[in-house]
Amino acid sequence: YAKEKGMEICRQKYGKFVCDILDYIVKGGHPNLFLHDNGLLYSNGKERVISWMNAVVDGRPVNPRSGYLVEFNGLWYNGLRFAAALFAEDSEMASKVEQWNEIADKTAESFVHTFLNDYGYLVDYVDGAMSDWSVRPNMLIALSLDYSPLDKRQRKRALEVVTRELLTPKGIRTLSPKSYGYNPTYVGSQTEREYAYHQGPARPWLMGAYADAYLK
């Protein structure tokens, strides 16, 4: 909306809403988004689904993604920088803008340290000492946004991994064939399909994020 109508109109229409969302998270209002001192958002997903990878069997998540989720924190960083840009010309919001930029600086440094591995792609989530190195499309969110904690070289290298391991003519795989648990066949009983749902079958909608990342 800001790109189409301009920042001024966007600020007039949605500025308070954007500010309220960030304040809600920063002040600890959300029951499952915890802002840590390192600038990253932590969420508990061990017992319930918290992301779009929401397959459930017997009331428990098939993919219990928990801790620092890569797409949550990519979106968090983007939101902070966008809000700071949205209110950059508003002198009454100078202290808020400074606060958001300070948090975003921490987020960016921690994001790279936490998610970017030696192979050039982003791990899917990190919870304490456990890092999920599965190659999944959630990293595309962080690669596709206007404000990214990664520099252009880092984004390009990560996208090359996505292209090599996840891109298909029909969409983006939900898991790389090289990653543990890969199962591209969505057939069988409801339970069998739930177990396979995010373990390899391609999703056409993820091509949007891929295209945005590619163009950047």
Residue ranges and their predicted role:
Residues Y1-I9, G74-A94, I141-K152, G208-K216:
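Well-ordered alpha-helical scaffold segments within catalytic/enzyme domains
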Residues A2-F17, G29-H36:
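Short secondary-structure capping/junction motifs at helix and strand boundaries
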Residues C10, A88-Q99, T168, S189:
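Serine/threonine-rich low-complexity intrinsically disordered regions
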Residues R11, G15, S66-N73, V97, ...:
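Amphipathic, non-membrane alpha-helical segments in soluble helical-bundle scaffolds
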Residues R11-V26, Y77, R81, V97-V112, ...:
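Hydrophobic core segments within long, regular secondary-structure runs in both alpha-
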Residues K13, F17-I21, H36-D37, P149, ...:
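Short, charge-rich amphipathic segments
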Residues K27-Y68, K106-W205:
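Extended glycan-interaction surfaces of carbohydrate-active proteins
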